[in-house]
């Protein structure tokens, strides 16, 4: 179970940054 959470957290952080940049525009960066 710990592995699943770690993998999800790692993907969320990477995917979250890309999604936020596209959804919020370049203002985030």
Curated annotation (Swiss-Prot):
Lineage: Bacteria, Bacillati, Bacillota, Clostridia, Eubacteriales
An annotated GO BP: pyridoxal phosphate biosynthetic process
Keyword Magnesium found: no
Protein name (database record): Pyridoxal 5'-phosphate synthase subunit PdxS
Family: Belongs to the PdxS/SNZ family.
Pathway note: Cofactor biosynthesis; pyridoxal 5'-phosphate biosynthesis
Note in the entry: On the 2D-gel the determined pI of this unknown protein is 5.1, its MW is 32.7 kDa.
Reaction it catalyzes: aldehydo-D-ribose 5-phosphate + D-glyceraldehyde 3-phosphate + L-glutamine = pyridoxal 5'-phosphate + L-glutamate + phosphate + 3 H2O + H(+)
Function: Catalyzes the formation of pyridoxal 5'-phosphate from ribose 5-phosphate (RBP), glyceraldehyde 3-phosphate (G3P) and ammonia. The ammonia is provided by the PdxT subunit. Can also use ribulose 5-phosphate and dihydroxyacetone phosphate as substrates, resulting from enzyme-catalyzed isomerization of RBP and G3P, respectively.
PROSITE patterns: PDXS_SNZ_2 (PS51129)
InterPro entries xrefs: PdxS/SNZ
Entry EC no(s): 4.3.3.6
Alphabetized UniProt keyword annotations: Lyase, Pyridoxal phosphate, Schiff base
UniProt keyword Lyase, yes or no: yes
Annotated source species: Clostridium pasteurianum
Entry superkingdom: Bacteria
Assembly and interaction partners: In the presence of PdxT, forms a dodecamer of heterodimers.
């Amino acid at each position: 179970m710990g592995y699943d959470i770690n993998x999800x957290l790692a993907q969320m952080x990477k995917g979250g940054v890309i999604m936020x940049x596209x959804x919020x525009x370049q203002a985030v960066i």
